[in-house]
Design a protein with these regions (language model features):
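Function-determining sites in protein domains
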Residues: 2-157
Length: 157
């Protein structure tokens, strides 16, 4: 009987630690973290920014696109599809601050009741910050985000 108690004594904490590790490694959906509406139809507009440093002049080039359901329904749907499909992996230490001189994307959506979601900041290498927590974005999601930016760039420039 004593051996069973010892086994349970060690098995329960080990199971809890395993559960915590699995929860830590489980990818999180971007739309859930951003507290977006349940449906993309409830999103009124999306603000999409790309900030790129010009190292020679120490300036930044900011391209800001505000996509609305009235003007650009297809583009808005494309970004909403990305927001609902993208996954963030592995919360990382770092205080939720991005220190990188590279290109940064910022996205946030506004629902039809005019409440804005939390912004997500994404670097080109796939690091992302939401609510002060640093995550890693999957490579396929990063490639899709770059494709959306290229699509926006060809339409508006």
């Amino acid at each position: 009987m004593n051996d069973k108690r010892k086994c349970l004594f060690w098995l329960i904490p080990a199971a809890l630690v395993l559960l915590a590790v699995l929860f830590f490694l489980y990818p999180r959906r971007v739309d859930v973290i951003l507290h977006m509406p349940a449906s993309a139809a409830d999103i009124r507009d999306v603000n999409f920014q790309r900030i790129e440093p010009v190292h020679e002049t120490l300036e930044y080039v900011c391209q800001n696109y505000t996509l609305t359901a009235e003007r650009e329904p297809e583009l808005l749907q494309e970004i909403c599809d990305w927001l609902y499909a993208a996954r963030l992996n592995r919360p990382m230490p770092g205080g939720g601050v991005l220190h990188d001189p590279g290109v940064m994307y910022t996205l946030y959506a506004r629902s039809s009741d005019s409440s804005a979601t939390t912004a997500i900041q994404i670097l080109e290498d796939g690091r992302a910050v939401v609510n002060g927590v640093l995550y890693r974005l999957r490579q396929q999601d990063m490639a899709a985000l770059n494709a959306i930016y290229q699509h926006l760039n060809t339409i508006y420039d």
